[in-house]
């Protein structure tokens, strides 16, 4: 895994977000690319609604992805420049 993060944050661009239901529990599947990845490898994570900070996320948004033990635990929409 290139640029794996055990604990910390990385900036990324949101490529896709879609709601999913896992055993009746609402979650989000997010697909993103890290800004510092020259190959723009797609990354995916499934997170609960409590892990998404920001009113509405849309493809193309800049986001901050927080990791703990290599797992996405928080996604925050960054202000536009």
Task: Label every model-predicted segment.
Residues 32-40:
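Short, flexible N-terminal segments of the mature chain
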Residues 68-79:
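Short, Lys/Arg- and Gly-enriched loop/turn segments at beta-strand edges
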Residues 1-18, 80-81:
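Short boundary/loop segments of OB/S1/cold-shock single-stranded nucleic-acid-binding domains
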Residues 6-8, 24-26, 57:
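A generic structural micro-feature
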Residues 59-62:
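Loop/turn positions that initiate beta-strands
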Residues 21-33:
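Short aromatic-glycine-enriched beta-strand elements
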Residues 39-56:
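Beta-strand/loop nucleic-acid-binding surfaces
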């Amino acid at each position: 895994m290139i640029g794996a993060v055990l604990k910390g944050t990385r900036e990324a661009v949101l490529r896709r977000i879609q709601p999913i239901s896992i055993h009746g529990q609402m979650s989000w599947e997010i697909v993103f690319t890290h800004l510092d990845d020259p190959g723009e490898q797609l990354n995916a994570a499934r997170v609960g609604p409590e892990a998404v900070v920001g009113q509405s996320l849309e493809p193309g948004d800049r986001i901050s992805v927080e990791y703990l033990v290599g797992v996405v635990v928080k996604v925050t929409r960054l202000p536009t420049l």
